[in-house]
């Protein structure tokens, strides 16, 4: 009798909770498929490096190279100056992105709404906006250095001028796409400008605004990495990669690229989560 009860308890302990089982059933394809894809890519990369098909260090070098292994497992050290762990370099880059991207979001949304509401402004400035958005981030670096004579504000300007255009253009398009029926109802109800803005314009244009914001966060992250590479003495992941290249630390470069990709992915997922959260409230 005791044995039967014990056996039943053991089976109950081995049975996963229904919540976990249901979550795994619903999400396993989304987890297993990427793992196979990433694993296959890493295996191909390591084999290519081991067979001498590429001079790029394989992923195993992150663990076999002592210097890179220390950087991987100890990202928080600070020996002063530019000799910092990767986490601190990443925080330096992200602080610049936060400033430049926030300015781009504020200005881009405000100007985009104005342009979307006013056809004369749209006709006057759309060619200029389309022209400026084609300029590559690196092309803005020397202009920013001439303007500000200092790396920090110059880097923030490069982020701002690179990331503002998707926000501005998508916001303007979202405002232009507000159905005419909504505008007519607002006129019939004699809605105030404030009510029209909060109850009609913003909810209607929000998907377009977030499309611009999501595109721009990626551009902002790419821009700061490029700017840090060519701005000497500026702590950040871009500087870390360039310094590793100059000293022929190939595995350090690989580690830096992994950090860049991981942070970029996190920023994109955060923006997607924020979009779903705010859109559901509207």
Where are these regions (language model features)?
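Periplasmic/extracellular loop-to-transmembrane helix junction in inner-membrane transport proteins
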Residues: 19-23, 50-102
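Transmembrane alpha-helices
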Residues: 157, 161, 193-225, 255, ...
